[in-house]
Structure formats: C-alpha cells, structure tokens
Amino acid sequence: MKNSVLIRKDGKFYHVFNDDAYIFNYLFNYNIVNYRVGFPISAYSKVINKLEENTINYVVLGDEKIEKNFKNKNKYKRVLELSIDKDRVFNKLKEINSKLEKLSYEELIRVVSILE
C-alpha cells in the first residue's frame, strides 16, 4: 500500500493526485479538482515544512528527485483517514445545505428551533 505523498512539478506549479489530493485538502484547504490539487512553486517550502511537521513521507519529482522517509513514524495512512473523513463530513454538510435552501422560511424557522 502507498505510504508517501507524490508531488510532481509541472512548469510553475506542483501537483498531487488522488489520495494525496485529499491529504492536501486536509492540511492546506486546497481545492480538489478532478482528484488533483495544484499549488504554485512559491508555496513549496510551506508544503514541505507542513509535511515534515506532520511526519508524512513524501517524494518530489521536479528538477531532481527528493525523498523523505520517516520510516515507522510516518503518519501518511492516519492523515489520509482523517482527510477522507473530513471530505465525507463536508460533502454531507453540502447535501444538508442544499436541502435547507429548498425550504420555505417557515420550515427553516422550525428546523432552527429544533437545532437550538
């Protein structure tokens, strides 16, 4: 099973894909588009520092290949689980919000009174 974030350089941006995109959404609030997250070269140091703070293995494929392996301290899998949970909760909140937007004012008042 995969245990490292793979970061690919493409011009003036870096990209991560699939599960790694969820991790980046969780750590940096970057938007996921088509299972991909991109960030500018200027954010590279911030990204690497955050991955190291969270002891997440990574591989950077850019001008040169850079690898960081935290061995048994690696938290890739745990952070991925948290990332997927966060995504699931936010998607559920979007569904709820969509339903709330369709309610009449009176129905909204009832919902709010129940929640309070």
Show where each model-derived region lies.
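Basic, polar low-complexity surface loops/patches
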Residues: 1-116
